[in-house]
Design a protein with these regions (language model features):
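Class I SAM-dependent transferase core
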Residues: 1-54, 60, 90-105
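Conserved S-adenosyl-L-methionine
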Residues: 61-65
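Conserved catalytic-site loops of classical short-chain dehydrogenases/reductases
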Residues: 58-59, 123
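Conserved SAM-binding loop of SAM-dependent methyltransferases across substrates and taxa
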Residues: 66-79
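S-adenosylmethionine
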Residues: 79-83, 87-153
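Amphipathic, non-transmembrane alpha-helical secondary structure
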Residues: 43, 47, 71, 133-137
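Glycine-rich phosphate-binding loop signature in dinucleotide/nucleotide-binding domains
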Residues: 52-55, 117-119
């Protein structure tokens, strides 16, 4: 992929690594690939968002885990209200800590399961969570009319 990134992710990666040392959000072996495998990969949606971003106000990341792709998208697109959903409290707490440390005002964390969410979203993302058929089952009812579901696979 070839696209321009407008955000300096240096502070984010530092804060993430501090949280990771405590909570093991990604394996220690994965830390050396944080930029390539997690941050840059999360921004793979960038070309799509640039085409449709005037129409995008809300984005839900189902099964956000360590905050990918939710946090990089929130940092790169301050005009989009990003919701990071995960059922595991320690992961949500870590993302909340990152949010506070970096003052990410357009990021909301939700500790719950997708089937319990009632709000509708313009875009739903999911990365490394479940099989595509299960993801479609959870995502479809949460999409606004003419919304988009983007599965990172």
């Amino acid at each position: 992929m070839n696209f321009k990134i407008n955000t300096d992710f240096t502070n984010y990666m530092k804060v993430f690594l501090v949280q990771n040392a405590v909570l093991n959000l990604i394996s220690k072996n994965e830390e050396k690939f944080l930029w390539e495998k997690h941050v840059y990969d999360s921004l793979g949606i960038k070309l799509f968002l640039e085409k449709y971003s005037p129409k995008v106000n809300t984005l839900l990341d189902i099964g956000t885990g360590g905050g990918f792709p939710a946090v990089p998208i929130a940092l790169e697109y301050p005009n989009i209200e990003v919701f990071a959903l995960d059922s595991i409290r320690k992961k949500i707490n870590a993302i909340e800590n990152i949010k506070q440390e970096l003052s990410i005002n357009n990021l909301t964390t939700i500790c719950d399961r997708a089937e319990n969410i009632e709000q509708k979203f313009d875009i739903i993302t999911s990365r490394a969570v479940a099989t595509i058929d299960i993801l479609i089952k959870y995502a479809t009812p949460l999409l606004k009319k003419n919304g988009y579901f983007v599965a990172y696979k």
